[in-house]
Amino acid sequence: MTPEQCRAARGWLGWSQKELARRAGVALNTVHGFESGHRTLIPNNIAALRRAIEAEGIRLLFDENGNAIGIARQNPVGGL
C-alpha cells in the first residue's frame, strides 16, 4: 500500500486519520507520518492499516509488477 492509496481509501470512507489509526490499532502519528511520506512503516503496521481499510470494502489495486495503481470499492465482507 502506498501513502496515496491510504489517503484515497480513507477519504472514500470519510475517515479522519484518527479514525483510521483507531480502527487499525496504530498510533495517530503512524498514519500521519505514512500519509505525508515522512515515515516508512514496518510491515505489521502496513498490514493493520490495510486490514482496516479492506474490512470496509476497499480493494487496493496493483499492476502485474506489483506497482500500486489505485483503489476500488467492493461490498464489505457479508455485504450485499
Write out the residue ranges for each language-model feature.
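DNA major-groove recognition helix of helix-turn-helix/homeodomain DNA-binding modules
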Residues: 25, 45-60
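Short basic helix-loop element that most often maps to the first helix and adjoining turn
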Residues: 4-19, 75-79
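Recognition helix of helix-turn-helix/homeodomain-like DNA-binding domains
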Residues: 26-41
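Residues in the recognition helix of alpha-helical DNA-binding motifs
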Residues: 9, 23, 34
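Helix-turn-helix/homeodomain-like alpha-helical modules used for DNA recognition
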Residues: 58-80
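Non-catalytic, surface-exposed connector residues within folded enzymatic/regulatory domains
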Residues: 40-43, 65
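Short, conserved glycine- and acidic-residue-centered signature motifs
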Residues: 13, 42-45
